[in-house]
Amino acid sequence: MNSKLSLPGKNLKMQKRRWKPTRMMLTRAHYRVDGQLCQHWRTNWQTSRGSLQIWCQVKKWVKSLLTRLGLSRMITSRRDQAFDMEMSLM
């Protein structure tokens, strides 16, 4: 029997770990001419531009609905302002 096979007790630490979502996603991996592995990473935010645009449309619709109903809009947070700024640059 191969001595390098892992025993069940050694994998206990790995079994306790849970998958956590990352902020980066591997979009492409290939080998260069010199044989080195080249990996292209992209933030999850960039990979979901379609859903991001849908979210912006919904957000604008809700804001306009609140305005038409005469309700005062809540003060937008700095995060929302940065988000709107990012969408205007696209």
UniProtKB/Swiss-Prot annotation:
The keyword Transit peptide does not apply. One of its GO terms (cellular component) is host cell nucleus. Disulfide bonds: none annotated. Residues 4-29 are annotated as: Nucleolar signal. One of its GO terms (biological process) is symbiont-mediated suppression of host innate immune response. Keywords: Host cytoplasm, Host nucleus, Host-virus interaction, Inhibition of host innate immune response by virus, Inhibition of host RLR pathway by virus, Viral immunoevasion. It is found in: Host cytoplasm, Host perinuclear region; Host cytoplasm; Host nucleus. The keyword rRNA-binding does not apply. Antagonizes host type-I IFN signaling pathway. Expressed from the S segment by a leaky scanning mechanism. The sequence shown is that of isolate Tula/Moravia/5302Ma/94. The isolate Tula/Moravia/5302Ma/94 that contains the full length NSs survives for more consequent passages than the isolate Tula/Moravia/5302v/95, which contains a truncated NSs protein. Interacts with host MAVS; this interaction may reduce MAVS ubiquitination. Belongs to the hantavirus NS-S protein family. This is Non-structural protein NS-S. It comes from Tula orthohantavirus.
